[in-house]
Each structure stands twice: as C-alpha cells, then as structure tokens.
Amino acid sequence: MPKFKPAGWPSVIPRIVTRDLTGLAGFLRDVLDAEGDVRSGAPTEIRIGDSIILISDGGGVRDAMPAFLYVYVENADETYRRAIAAGAESIEAPADTPYGDRRAMVRDTWANVWQIATYRGN
C-alpha cells in the first residue's frame, strides 16, 4: 500500500469549491446517492459509487470553483429527473450516444455541470 496517500483513495480526486457546502452535499446525496457528511474546517469527502469527490467552502483564499464531471449511474433517465426536481437546469435531455452511453447533462444551482450516463453497450 502506498504511503503517500490514504488507503482506498485514487491518485486523482476532483475537488469542488462552493459557497454552499451543505446545499451541494444535499444535492449530491439526493440526486447521485452520494455518501458523506459535511465537516467544518476541512474538505468534505463525498463518495459516489466507487469514486471520491472533495467539496469545500469557498471564500477567503479560495473563490468558488465549479466542476464539469462525467458520472456513471444505474439509470441516467431517473437520475436526470431527480436532478431537475432538485433544481438543476437541463443542458441535454437523456439521449443515446454512438459509443454506447445513454447520457444527459445538467447544471446544478452552484454552476457545476454533470454529465450523467448509463453504459448500454455498443
């Protein structure tokens, strides 16, 4: 096990800096079945499936910094509907792609863009 990173963590971890840590964490739990609790004074570790995202408060030294992330889910259509119900803006409605993904795209209230996909095969 490498000693340069925590056990079970990948080498690359996306980080979102937001001005509403609690709101964004709630959105991720409601829409993407994310797990993780907001921690004060430290980045919040959010787990989505087998992946980790760090989210932290903006302000002070860091300005809010949104992300563009591609996320595989069990049902892209249902996840898209949940995102819209949670206040996200539709960028692309669910559609099949030539590379086997059923994919949609939304922008959340905090300006993060989420491509939501389910692989269906070629």
What are these model-predicted stretches?
Residues 1-7, 11-19, 44-47, 60-122:
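Vicinal oxygen chelate
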Residues 14-16, 37-39, 93-96:
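Short beta-strand-to-loop elements that line the ligand-binding cleft
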Residues 22-30, 104, 113:
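Conserved active-site alpha-helix within GNAT-family acetyltransferase domains
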Residues 35-67, 113-118:
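Conserved short beta-strand elements that form part of the metal-binding/catalytic scaffold
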